[in-house]
A protein has these predicted regions:
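Long, well-ordered alpha-helical scaffolding segments within enzyme catalytic domains
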Residues: 2-12, 112, 219-238, 265-280
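A short beta-strand motif that forms the metal-chelation/ATP-contact edge
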Residues: 251-257, 298-301
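Short beta-strand
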Residues: 132-134, 240-246, 287-291
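Nucleic-acid 5′ end/cap handling module spanning
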Residues: 1-8, 55-60, 220, 243, ...
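C-terminal accessory nucleic-acid interaction domains of nucleic acid-metabolism proteins
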Residues: 12, 16, 22-111, 121, ...
Length: 381
């Protein structure tokens, strides 16, 4: 209040306007003042007309003369001692520990996505994303983000998608490796992807079964389940691949020709999972119920509906040890002793080998009438 009174006294009204030809509708209510006071104002930017946008008055500057005031030019933010550039992207607080137990920093996360970025984009590019962000590290507050709520880097692309309530929202997607690095700069650790690309959101091209074990089950049970799912798909005429998720489970997945819509893909995967559970009720369940999952593996088919996501190949997981979701061959899977054995530091060796997921992605398959008929016959048997 004291500041406002001070300001009112300082702004002595003129009797006549300082400009000619002032419109009456303006002049009637205007109070004219001399331009000899200097105010400090916080604001976001100048508009194209030179007007301050989102201005906030901070106080008068009695130490400055009005004749000394000039328009400020934007200045680059000074680089901090712990900042660095990765893949052309400025990474702030690069030394901040993101995985404290593993000693991995924010800069390490960015460098991981620089290394695996080209391969990731080949597999997940142009798909709507859900980012799992941990700005203060995995021990701090973490959250999912799928919409562009403002402040996200330009390296991430946007696509407007109609949601279930009929409203449209801008979703994020990556088109190049620095998209992933830029998201890492914003604290993103995990990248989860849709089963369709932005140019045909109504036509899924990826089908995933996420094998999610109950707490009491051991890795050999999960590994055996992955092979059983693979064999059942093979019996239907479908070839599949495996991704160890960096958590407890395995994704058995295949690439689809874009000939079917979401309803068909969802119904196929639901029927498949329920048949597996019906034929092996002591080992599998096809519902999310925690009570029914006791001692069993949930064959999660729900990844195959519009808007659902699955962890992207080569994405980090926000878990102790900095594990990575890694595609493997069936021969490699047979020799693994866990689903989270790959770490950030193992990626150089992985990148020296051909990518198993690329072989799966290039083997486009279709849910033909013949495949669906085989599934129907199997379900009735």
């Amino acid at each position: 209040e004291e500041m406002m009174n001070d300001l009112a006294r300082a702004m002595t009204a003129r009797k006549t306007p300082p400009a000619r030809d002032v419109p009456p509708e303006v002049a009637d209510d205007a109070k004219w003042v001399r331009a000899d006071l200097v105010a400090e104002v916080n604001f976001t930017e100048f508009t194209a007309d030179g007007v301050i946008r989102h201005g906030s008055f901070l106080g008068l500057r009695h130490d400055k003369d009005a004749t000394q005031v000039t328009v400020e030019e934007p200045q680059e933010e000074p680089q901090r001692a712990d900042d660095s550039k990765v893949g052309g992207v400025q990474i702030s607080n690069a030394n901040r520990k993101v995985f404290p137990d593993a000693g991995c920093t924010k800069g390490d996360v960015a460098r991981h996505y620089e290394r695996v970025g080209p391969r990731m984009i080949d597999l997940m590019g142009h798909r709507p994303l859900s980012l799992f962000r941990c700005p203060s590290g995995i021990d701090g507050q973490c959250f999912f983000q799928k919409h562009d709520s403002g402040g996200m880097p330009d390296a991430l692309s946007r696509v407007s998608i109609e949601e279930s309530d009929g409203d449209a929202a801008d979703y994020l997607y990556a088109t190049r490796p620095d998209s992933l690095i830029a998201a890492a700069q914003m604290g993103s650790i995990e990248y989860h992807i849709w089963g369709a690309r932005v140019d045909r959101l109504d036509r899924p091209d990826r089908l995933v079964f996420d094998l999610d074990p109950d707490e009491g089950l051991d890795w050999p049970d999960v590994r055996a389940a992955a092979f059983e799912v693979r064999n059942a798909l093979t019996a239907l005429g479908l070839q599949s691949g495996a991704i160890v998720t960096g958590g407890k489970g395995v994704h058995v997945w295949l690439a689809l020709r874009r000939t079917r819509g979401w309803e068909t893909v969802k119904l196929f995967s639901k029927t498949f999972a329920h048949v597996m559970a019906a034929q092996n009720p002591d080992r599998y369940v096809a519902t999310m119920s925690k009570a029914k999952r006791k001692g069993r593996i949930f064959i999660d088919w729900l990844r195959n509906e519009r808007g659902a996501t699955a962890i992207a190949p080569y994405s980090l997981r926000a878990r102790p040890g900095a594990p990575v979701a890694v595609p493997v061959t069936w021969e490699e899977l047979e020799k693994l002793d866990s689903a989270n054995g790959f770490r950030m530091g193992d990626m150089a060796a992985q990148l020296d080998q051909p990518c198993p997921a690329m072989a799966v992605q290039n083997d486009l398959q279709a849910l033909t009438d013949g495949v669906i008929e085989k599934l129907q016959t199997w379900s009735e048997g």
